[in-house]
Amino acid sequence: MFTGIVEEIGEVTTLNTTSPDGGTTLTIALPPTSTLLSDCHLGDSIAINGVCLTVTTFLPQSFTVGIAPETLRLTNLGSLTPSSRVNLERAVRADTRMGGHFVQGHVDTTATILSKIPDGNAITFRFAPKNKDVLRYVVYKGFIALDGASLTVTKVNDEEGWWEVMLIAYTQEKIVTAAKGVGETVNVEVDMTAKYVEKSIQGYLAGMMEDGQGLPWLQKMVERIVAQGFS
């Protein structure tokens, strides 16, 4: 579990697709002054661009993780190259301040940057998700994790299939997204609370339908929505 508050920006040194163990490994170097690995242990979880990965080896200023094929298919990690910069966050502890929101490190899809527009010293980014199904979990003023950074949705358009976030000057210095351009991608994890709410409502409605109570309730809801729409 993570908070979406990026702790450090690391730099890719190697992305090895022919690791001796048959998998893909990714090695990240840290700035000389970084203390990110000061309490690191083998097997610890670290989010790299929002993807929860397991530390397999580490030195004081670098570490290596293994990447599963499914992770490469669902995320933008496979497009990383030496010198690519990535967002890093350690897993939360019991005493961690929740400065962002609950982030699992389980990426739902990627999104492409459609536009990048300065607004004073802030920047507004517009994103279109590869998997449009995630849009039902994206709401105005809601949380969304982009490359692991907890951000607030400032605008969303379900019909056209995009949402926007705004990065203030401080945030631009702390995450890699600010340096990305139109056409580049970010990893997306929607707020898991929305998924739990959807699952609960689906179960509740299914139970009502089995009891024969669901149809009248649904009819009343539709009538109310129609009445509001034409009032």
Residue spans of the language-model regions?
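Conserved loop->alpha-helix
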Residues: 1-231
